[in-house]
């Protein structure tokens, strides 16, 4: 009936973190996802380039900071939305691994282009032409991020099927919690790399405070 609830008995066997990791590592498709997630972690550093552009450039030069946040944030969201709508159908017809590699490149190159674009027009990024160019760049980056998210979920679902085929059980919870583990691990690695990079160039400690104080006092990248 409508008010009847199906009760599924919980599994008697419980696994700790060590056992769960062994299950994940022993599954070849998921192991490949784990390794690729670690290898992709430096891409997250490129996100800081975008945030630097928004916070230090548009946030300090122009009074319409929220307008630019809406424009570029909308570009990222739009790119993600379109990619997430298209990728499931494309994944049915094309090799998922190649699509994952392509999406990684698609997400990395646009963010990497932000600094060269700044060098081309350091004083004119508020002009319609450059705003349009950056809109396209952010949209492509958002598309790459959205495609990666969908493909990772699809490929982890395939890993669950693989485990069921070879071991006779479906560790859905283990593998999809592993997806969160991959994301957190990648973020941690990228943060370490980013911190080391900032230390090498001297952008840490008192220098960060000095930079922020200078910006608050009216300094701008246009004067460089």
Show the residue positions of the predicted features.
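Membrane-embedded alpha-helical bundles of multi-pass transporters/translocases
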Residues: 1-224
């Amino acid at each position: 009936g409508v008010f009847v609830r199906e009760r599924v008995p919980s599994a008697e066997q419980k696994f700790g973190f060590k056992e769960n990791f062994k299950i994940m590592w022993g599954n070849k498709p998921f192991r490949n996802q784990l390794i690729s997630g670690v290898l992709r972690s430096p891409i997250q550093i490129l996100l800081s380039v975008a945030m630097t552009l928004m916070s230090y450039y548009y946030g300090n030069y122009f009074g319409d900071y929220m307008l630019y946040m809406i424009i570029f944030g909308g570009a990222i969201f739009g790119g993600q939305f379109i990619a997430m709508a298209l990728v499931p159908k494309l994944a049915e017809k094309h090799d998922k691994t190649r699509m994952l590699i392509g999406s990684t490149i698609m997400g990395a190159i646009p963010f990497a282009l932000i600094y060269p674009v700044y060098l081309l027009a350091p004083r004119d990024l508020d002009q319609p032409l450059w705003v349009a160019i950056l809109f396209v760049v952010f949209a492509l980056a958002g598309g790459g991020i959205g495609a990666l998210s969908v493909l990772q979920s699809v490929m982890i679902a395939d890993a669950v099927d693989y485990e069921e085929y070879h071991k006779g059980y479906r560790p859905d919870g283990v593998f999809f919690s592993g997806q969160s583990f991959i994301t957190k691990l990648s973020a941690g690695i990228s943060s370490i790399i980013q911190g080391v990079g900032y230390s090498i160039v001297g952008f840490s400690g008192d220098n960060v405070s000095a930079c922020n104080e200078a910006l608050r006092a009216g300094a701008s990248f246009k004067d460089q």
